[in-house]
Amino acid sequence: MKQLTFKQYRQIDLTILCLLTAVFEAIATYSSSYWLVFQAMTISVTLTLTCITMVRWNGYAIAPMFVGSFVYCLVSGATLKQFFIYCFGSSFCLLSLLLFKKISKEKVRTSFAIRLSFVLSTYLFVAIGRWICSLPFEFSFNTIVAFIFTDILSLLFAVIVLTLAKNADGLIEDQKSYLLRIEKERIEEEKANSYNPF
């Protein structure tokens, strides 16, 4: 059986992540319209899956973020203006990758403080991006407050999921590093077995 190339592996992984984002975002948005109908809040899985993708694939995380934003707007019956604000404003999430210029991605998995900082910065950059994209239509500082407040449940959900998933092997890990690690472990295991007479 022919082995996958790194590029093929990345494409498959990103496709799965985007499909998961689309399905769960549609379910969450549809459910929120009933459960949170009297509250100025929504819950989204897009932030969670985008954070996981950023750790795994860096800037390719723009894919699930765009998909999630598009599906949210589609299911919630958004206007063209809202499509623009959410789909393009959410791309500001990538600014939180600057955190990894100073801190190892491994810290997201091992340190709660770093994990919280990473998710919070991603969340805030998304809110700021949406606000900036809304400025051509309406200049108001109240808008950014609304963006931050309405998605607060999504922030909490993302922190909880990433904390629960931190021990899942390879899930919250840079995939290039992960593949190199498991290949090294495989070689070491083969060497150990070759010296074992039994």
Please place each PLM-identified region on the residue numbering.
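Hydrophobic transmembrane alpha-helices
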Residues: 1-56
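Seven-transmembrane-like multi-pass membrane architecture, highlighting hydrophobic TM helices
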Residues: 8, 59, 69-70
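Alpha-helical transmembrane segments
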Residues: 21-22, 94, 155, 159
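Residue-level recognition of pore/gate-forming positions within transmembrane alpha-helices
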Residues: 22-25, 69-70, 90
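Membrane-embedded alpha-helical hairpins and interfacial helices in multi-pass inner-membrane proteins
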Residues: 30-40, 79-89, 99-198
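Alpha-helical transmembrane segments and their membrane-interface exit regions
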Residues: 48-50, 89-98
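Membrane-helix interface "capping/anchor" motifs
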Residues: 52-66, 104-106
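Membrane-helix boundary elements
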Residues: 63-85
